Amino acid sequence: MSRIARTFAGLKAQGRKALIPYVTAGFPFPDITPELMHAFVAGGADVIELGVPFSDPSADGPVIQKAGDKALAAGIGMVQVLDMVRTFRTRDASTPVVLMGYANPVERYNQKHDRHDGKSAFVLDAAAAGVDGVLIVDYPPEECEAFAAELKSAGLDLIFLLAPTSTDERMQQVARVASGYVYYVSLKGVTGSGALDTGAVEAMLPRIRAHVQVPVGVGFGIRDAATARTIGQVADAVVIGSKIIQLIDEQPRDQVGPVAQKFLCEIRTALDN
């Protein structure tokens, strides 16, 4: 059983829901990420999604795009992201870490670090660094069977997005290769956009669960404790990204961790009560 699966199983046994914060690696300061990840855990995070900066992030709204641009300008790439996870693991061997990003940085890493043995350098190095799962936004499930098999052999989960527009056929395709959890994108559009229709989310989750056996996390549009509580009543996990990025942007360095931790404590309390 993977670290992600163990985490969800433990939460289910306690009747609790997973809190999954997201941050772009290297934002808002290039060397703050491991420290910020520990602040997330202190605030009640169960899983951490770490965004890999990319120059053309098609699913990301302006808030996360800006964070990615800032991280890229500071020289943050896949090598640095894996180093951050490795550093985090020196003090935390239990909190699952998921890398979220796009195919291009993964493929570039494989090309640059090719071992000429037919195996994915990214998968092997991610596993060695302490990564638990991977969510590649632009990898369609019908083309992912070989990648999923490589990840599984290395002990990593492959996580997919589902959307309000996802058909039953797409859900079945995702179910064949997904592990860990699936991430339901509760809004049409990009991250941080629009108001969340909690009723629509509640109506969609039984459809997803009819096809998908892994836990279902919900993200996009969750900005406060009240919304998180409502979503937590129907989902297995609540994912929050853009709001965290907004809160820590422009904070002085010594306030980044405390501000994020305080916000997550509020969300955690709402989910648990």
Curated annotation (Swiss-Prot):
The keyword Protein transport does not apply. Its EC number is 4.2.1.20. GO terms for molecular function: tryptophan synthase activity. Signal peptide: none annotated. The active site is at 49 (proton acceptor), 60 (proton acceptor). It comes from the Bacteria. Tetramer of two alpha and two beta chains. PANTHER family: TRYPTOPHAN SYNTHASE ALPHA CHAIN, CHLOROPLASTIC, TRYPTOPHAN SYNTHASE, ALPHA CHAIN. Belongs to the TrpA family. The alpha subunit is responsible for the aldol cleavage of indoleglycerol phosphate to indole and glyceraldehyde 3-phosphate. This is Tryptophan synthase alpha chain. The lineage of its organism: Bacteria, Pseudomonadati, Pseudomonadota, Betaproteobacteria, Burkholderiales.
